[in-house]
Amino acid sequence: MKTCWQILEIESTTQIDIIRQAYLARLPLCHPETDPQGFKALRQAYEEALRLAVNPVEEADDEEKDAAAEHEILRAFRTLLDSESDRFQPSAWQKFIQQLNTWNMEDVDQLRWPLCAIAIEARYLSLNCASLLAERLNWHSFNDSEGMDEEEREAFLEAIQAGDCFDFLSLLEYPIALQNQTVEYYFALERCCRYHPDYVTAFLAMEGPWLIPDDAKLHRKLLRWYSSVQTGMAELIPVAQQWQTEEPESEDARYYLCAQRLYCGEGESLLADLCAYWESYPSTQADNLLLQWSKRHCPDYFALLVMVIEARSMVDAQGQPLKYVPGESARTRLLWAEILHSGKLSPLGQSFIESLFFKRKAWAWWKSRVGSETEQDSPFLDLYRVAEQVVLEAFPKQEMLARLNTRLEGGDAHPLEAIVTRMLLTKVKLEPEDEDVDEPTPENHEEKNDEGEKPQSITSIIKISLTVLVIGYALGKIAMLFS
């Protein structure tokens, strides 16, 4: 049962003004029409607090009487929770349950919710141990919790089902103050990750000498928590490596290892493992890691990788690629715009993305600034030219594809270049007549336009003249009928 001070949510005091203010503050929450029971409890607490404020000696006497009248089992339970050596020991809790079993069923029924209330108030409680008592007393099955807040009780029982975030027995070798600090820190961190994910980054950034218990369950949770907010922790890399050693086929182990290496700032040494993971386990998570690495270390590949990821997602039920032109989705264009305005691209990479945003006709690809580049030795030039033609739904020259394919088969291609080249070779289907087709020149095209425009203009004039004659003839006939 809650005391009057707990209901009013203030500390014990003899100042009547503080009691009255607390009562008025709680009154709107317990209106007599909407919550008559809550209002009754609040009113009784207010009157009791006023009485104790007038006679504080009576409160001390009441506390002594309550302590003396408290059931033996309740006192034993408080002793267990305060014990530095037994509070986290399942065997000690089993011993307490055996002591509880010596009482008759009527007494146990009366003790069910008082024991639950004491457990809820405990600051440093092992939920794994509390689950033993919850199972014995059927806290999950009964709803007749006398005098307890229902929401508070449900939240506590839900926490018991989730269990401790790590094995508290791993703390027994440390001083009691460090035990309490560690339990409190990880309990708050887990609640923050579960109910307030927007504040996890700020929580993890808090400075302090935090102990990391030797518990594999906690270590994997830390991997998940840190990776979810894209934060690196060097101490977690060996944890992920050990996980992968124990479970070589685990997709999660490989993901968290790549993620932590990336967020800890690893560069080229990570790329081979990251590409292997991306190819072995296609997923949105793998796509995001690859794009993040490219954005940090090789931004000129970023736009090409976005096309690769979009193309890979466009497959039929049998896993065969669809006839789909990359660059049409809103997400792709948003990512292109993001890297374009990041200031990280080379002039060649910037001109490539700009050409994609302003698509030309397939025959006029020479107008693109990518096509006019003179950096023949650039490893990106062939990639950009072929990729642009894929977006424009045109046929690239075979010699460009041949150079890319030679680099790929010879093992000279950068890992990201290899990924992009394979996508382009899949998307492009050359026709035999395309091999010897040269790029059109602007002069030739303009001449063709001039030659084609002349007969088209004469035909239009003839059509208009005939139309006027027909209309005039029809109007004349109509006029003759009415004359």
Curated annotation (Swiss-Prot):
Biased composition (Basic and acidic residues): 442-454
Example GO molecular function: ATPase activator activity
Region (Disordered): 431-456
GO biological process: response to cadmium ion
GO CC terms, sorted: plasma membrane
J domain span: 3-70
Residue stretches of biased makeup (Acidic residues): 432-441
InterPro entries in the cross-refs: J_dom_sf
Membrane-spanning residues: none
Keywords: Chaperone
Name by which UniProt lists this protein: Uncharacterized J domain-containing protein DjlC
Gene name per UniProt: djlC
